[in-house]
């Protein structure tokens, strides 16, 4: 009888011990995100979460997202500590625009070969994003899949569930002629447009780690984590009559603002009301990007736009700026039957 080598899962490229080491490393940071509604801890087959008792007619709101090719840039620059914040931000910001309070978050981390240090940095960032948004990181999936990804490359996806009172859902139906638009400043490109960012870096021959912009490396501007607006916006909703909120993600101004506008309304944006952060000027110049394309691809310094009645503007601005936001009046809503839903002038 011919002796055969005994094969193990590790021989096939899957290191269960590394996975267990990762769980042990992240338990502490995950525990810090726990909300009182969460039942049980990490390791169960499913996560249990009760609804907060303050809701009379609770409606669940769900969302899922990734961080696009910003992840490729983070891997190339070996900076993994904030990409998890981006992941949470892309999900929870989508929930809060409908008035929802994020409850819990789950992540999916897939890689060809699990590096415990890298995965721990990413998941610690996810936990930080959950802390910033007040939701619990209740579980996730770490998939080591040799042959599916090159080396230690990885991909991430996030899933979030929130809750809103049925009578307080924000859906844009109250938007009307004369409403004022308030902008919330962004921290940079957030997590959109990075295929164009990477193309601009390639064509320009620029090294983002040695190129300086506003006194710090360009890489710091490009990898600045997506701003999480949840706590500021939830407080605003409690105290001000908010008609609509648009999260400026893929598609920029042209595609995201119309998503919350009723028929026969038009958003008129005053371009003179703010200056683009320098990173957007650099991208436009280095890539020779047309103005219209900038507004279609990037947020150009505006992370969210909020529509509300004119008498509420001063109160809203005071609240938002007191909570650390950079908020300003950026435009108005006009009655219009034009097919052009957004005008920038």
From Swiss-Prot:
Q: Is this entry keyworded Protease?
A: no
What pathway does the annotation place this protein in?
Purine metabolism; IMP biosynthesis via de novo pathway; 5-amino-1-(5-phospho-D-ribosyl)imidazole from N(2)-formyl-N(1)-(5-phospho-D-ribosyl)glycinamide: step 2/2
Q: Which example biological process does GO assign this protein?
A: 'de novo' IMP biosynthetic process
What catalytic activity does the UniProt entry give for this protein?
A: 2-formamido-N(1)-(5-O-phospho-beta-D-ribosyl)acetamidine + ATP = 5-amino-1-(5-phospho-beta-D-ribosyl)imidazole + ADP + phosphate + H(+)
Enzyme class of the recorded protein, top EC level: ligase
Gene3D superfamilies, per database record: PurM-like C-terminal domain, PurM-like, N-terminal domain
Location of the protein in the cell: Cytoplasm
Task: Identify the Pfam families for this entry.
Answer: AIRS, AIRS_C
User: What's this protein's family per the entry?
Assistant: Belongs to the AIR synthase family.
Is Coiled coil among this UniProt entry's keywords?
Answer: no
Q: Which organism is it from?
A: Escherichia coli (strain K12)
- State the GO CC annotations: cytosol
Q: Which InterPro entries match?
A: PurM-like_C_dom, PurM-like_C_sf, PurM-like_N, PurM-like_N_sf, PurM_cligase
Q: Which UniProt keywords apply?
A: ATP-binding, Cytoplasm, Ligase, Nucleotide-binding, Purine biosynthesis
Q: Domain of life, per the record?
A: Bacteria
Protein name as annotated: Phosphoribosylformylglycinamidine cyclo-ligase
EC number assigned by the record: 6.3.3.1
HAMAP family hit by this protein: AIRS
């Amino acid at each position: 009888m011919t002796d055969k080598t005994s094969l193990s899962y590790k021989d096939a490229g899957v290191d269960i011990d590394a996975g267990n080491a990762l769980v042990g490393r992240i338990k502490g940071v995950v525990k810090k995100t726990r909300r009182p509604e969460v039942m049980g801890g990490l390791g169960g087959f499913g996560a249990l979460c009760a609804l907060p008792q303050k809701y009379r007619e609770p409606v669940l709101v769900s969302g899922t997202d990734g961080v696009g090719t910003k992840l490729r840039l983070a891997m190339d620059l070996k900076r993994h500590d904030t990409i998890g914040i981006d992941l949470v931000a892309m999900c929870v910001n989508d929930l809060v625009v409908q008035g929802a309070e994020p409850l819990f978050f789950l992540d999916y981390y897939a890689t060809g070969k699990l590096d415990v240090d890298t995965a721990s940095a990413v998941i610690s960032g996810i936990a930080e994003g959950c802390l910033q948004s007040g939701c619990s990181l209740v579980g996730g999936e770490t998939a080591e899949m040799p042959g599916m990804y090159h080396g230690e490359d990885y991909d991430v996806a996030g899933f979030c569930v929130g809750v809103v009172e049925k009578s307080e859902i924000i859906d844009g139906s109250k938007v009307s002629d004369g409403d004022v638009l308030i902008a919330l400043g962004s921290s940079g490109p957030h997590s959109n447009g990075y295929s164009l960012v990477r193309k601009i870096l390639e064509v320009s021959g620029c090294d983002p780690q040695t190129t300086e912009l506003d006194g710090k490396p360009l890489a710091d501007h490009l990898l600045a984590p997506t701003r999480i607006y949840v706590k500021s916006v939830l407080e605003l909703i409690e105290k001000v009559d908010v008609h609509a909120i648009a999260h400026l993600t893929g598609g920029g101004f042209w595609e995201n603002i119309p998503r919350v506008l009723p028929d026969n309304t038009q958003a008129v944006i005053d371009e003179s009301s703010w200056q683009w952060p320098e990173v957007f000027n650099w991208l436009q110049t280095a890539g020779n990007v047309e103005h219209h394309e900038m507004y279609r691809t990037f947020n150009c310094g505006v992370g969210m736009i909020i529509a509300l009645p004119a008498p509420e503007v001063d109160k809203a601005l005071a609240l938002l700026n007191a909570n650390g936001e950079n908020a300003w009046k950026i435009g108005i809503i006009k009655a219009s039957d034009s097919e052009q839903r957004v005008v920038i002038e």
